[in-house]
């Protein structure tokens, strides 16, 4: 849910199931936006800082702008019921870089019911992937129906898993009821600009 009062930096939660492409999305977004905006990232993993390492190795941003949080428990608890570890990571980044425009907060892989605390994020992006099957949009859940922007990733795999993009398009429009979403292929960049454009529009709106 969009906040009425803009907090600088804009905090964007990125959620979705394991393997849907959250980290890959952040890599692409950071590389596309970092020349024009001051960015930072907080990643969440249960027992490791693997997603932090992936983003650093990919040169998504400089290493000091990417903070890894080991939640040690259920992924949605760390972004919803007790977001204290993530809030601390956000505050540390703000203290270190006083000119940040956007902080992305990537949740650990979770189910379709995961949501971010409004204390933690101003906008929520949710990532699912075609490889999970064309039934996923109609399963619903807050990530599908209420996220500010839904990304349906890995469209290049549709033919290999027997998923119909036409069915996913129909069901997503029904479930989203006018809220924005996009198909993406993060390997080719297909659909990424629509995500960037949405972020920038909301940033202006919330100022």
From Swiss-Prot:
GO terms for biological process: urea catabolic process. Pfam families: cobW. It comes from the Bacteria. Keywords: Chaperone, Cytoplasm, GTP-binding, Nickel insertion, Nucleotide-binding. It is found in: Cytoplasm. InterPro entries: CobW/HypB/UreG_nucleotide-bd (IPR003495), P-loop_NTPase (IPR027417), UreG (IPR004400). GO terms for molecular function: GTP binding; GTPase activity; nickel cation binding. GO terms for cellular component: cytoplasm. GTP binds at residues 16-23. Its main location: cytoplasm. CDD domains: UreG. Facilitates the functional incorporation of the urease nickel metallocenter. This process requires GTP hydrolysis, probably effectuated by UreG. Homodimer. UreD, UreF and UreG form a complex that acts as a GTP-hydrolysis-dependent molecular chaperone, activating the urease apoprotein by helping to assemble the nickel containing metallocenter of UreC. The UreE protein probably delivers the nickel. Belongs to the SIMIBI class G3E GTPase family. UreG subfamily. This is Urease accessory protein UreG. It comes from Blochmanniella pennsylvanica (strain BPEN).
């Amino acid at each position: 849910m969009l906040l009425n009062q803009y907090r600088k930096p804009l905090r964007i939660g990125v959620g979705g199931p394991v393997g849907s492409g959250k980290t890959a999305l952040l890599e692409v977004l950071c590389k596309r936006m970092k020349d024009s905006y001051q960015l930072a990232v907080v990643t969440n993993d249960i027992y490791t800082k693997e997603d932090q390492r992936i983003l650093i190795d990919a040169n998504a941003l400089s290493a000091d702008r990417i903070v890894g949080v080991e939640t040690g428990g259920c992924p949605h608890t760390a972004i919803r019921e007790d977001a204290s570890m993530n809030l601390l990571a956000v505050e540390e980044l703000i203290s270190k870089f006083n000119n940040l425009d956007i902080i992305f907060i990537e949740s650990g892989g979770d189910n379709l019911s995961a949501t971010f605390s409004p204390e933690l994020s101003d906008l929520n992006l949710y990532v699912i992937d075609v490889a999970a099957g064309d039934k996923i949009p109609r399963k619903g859940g807050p990530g599908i129906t209420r996220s500010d922007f839904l990304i349906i990733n890995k469209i290049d795999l549709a033919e290999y898993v027997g998923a119909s993009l036409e069915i996913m398009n129909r069901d997503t429009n029904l479930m989203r009821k006018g809220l924005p979403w996009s198909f993406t292929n993060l390997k080719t960049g297909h659909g990424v600009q629509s995500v960037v454009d949405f972020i920038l529009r909301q940033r202006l709106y919330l100022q």
